[in-house]
């Protein structure tokens, strides 16, 4: 069984509530998405491997801890994933970035891949997949399956909110992939949207219809 990490810090929950409002402007929605993802990054990377190195301060030589190995790859599921990518890169600016282009067929709700670009040494890195919503789970399942073909050291999935159906779908296909989210909402509607949700994250981030 996979693990769902619910990040319920007061700042995260406050900002998520502001995002949910239907009268939130594109600018406000985008800013809040970045702020929430930045705050969530602390918890997502809590168990990242560390190593000790020797450094020199203005007063003496000492040791300190830094992130070990070749670090991270943030993988954005296009297009909405880019809306929370910047917030995470604010915290880890040295991370590599990959992109998976997926669109949801409006009739079948099946994820269709149209783009895939990753660092060449993905097998030496830890991957954090980012997408604002884990709804039907079809895109997440397809993205993780594709990434596993490259053999990364580990994979985590980060979203602003999800629902029981999305959690169940990703857990059934990839029980080894932990999910980090700010909320688990009630359910999906007949069109595959999360209720009460935040609407179409991509449209609200980019100001499109």
UniProtKB/Swiss-Prot annotation:
The chain's disulfide connectivity reads none
Q: In which pathway does it act?
A: Pyrimidine metabolism; UMP biosynthesis via salvage pathway; UMP from uracil: step 1/1
State the Pfam families in the record.
UPRTase (PF14681)
Q: What is its EC number?
A: 2.4.2.9
Provide the GO biological process annotations: UMP salvage; uracil salvage
Q: What does the note under cofactor report?
A: Binds 1 Mg(2+) ion per subunit. The magnesium is bound as Mg-PRPP.
The protein depicted here goes by the name Uracil phosphoribosyltransferase
């Amino acid at each position: 069984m996979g693990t769902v990490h619910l990040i319920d810090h007061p700042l995260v929950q406050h900002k998520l509530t502001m995002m949910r409002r239907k009268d939130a402007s594109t600018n406000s929605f985008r800013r809040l998405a970045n702020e929430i993802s930045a705050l969530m990054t602390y918890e997502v990377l809590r168990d990242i491997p560390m190593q000790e190195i020797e450094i020199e301060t203005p007063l003496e030589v000492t040791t300190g801890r830094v992130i070990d190995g070749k670090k991270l790859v943030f993988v954005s599921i296009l297009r909405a994933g880019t809306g929370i990518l910047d917030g995470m890169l604010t915290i880890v600016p040295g991370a590599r970035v990959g992109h998976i282009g997926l669109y949801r067929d409006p009739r079948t709700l099946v994820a269709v891949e149209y783009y895939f670009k990753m660092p060449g040494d993905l097998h030496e890195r830890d991957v954090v997949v980012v997408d604002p919503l884990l709804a039907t789970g079809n895109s997440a399942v397809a993205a993780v399956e594709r990434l596993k073909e490259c053999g990364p050291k580990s994979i985590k999935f980060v979203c602003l909110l999800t629902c029981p159906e999305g959690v169940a779908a990703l857990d059934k296909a990839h029980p080894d992939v932990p999910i980090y989210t700010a909320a688990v909402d009630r359910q999906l509607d007949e069109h595959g949207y999360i209720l009460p949700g935040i609407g179409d994250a991509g449209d609200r981030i980019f100001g499109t219809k």
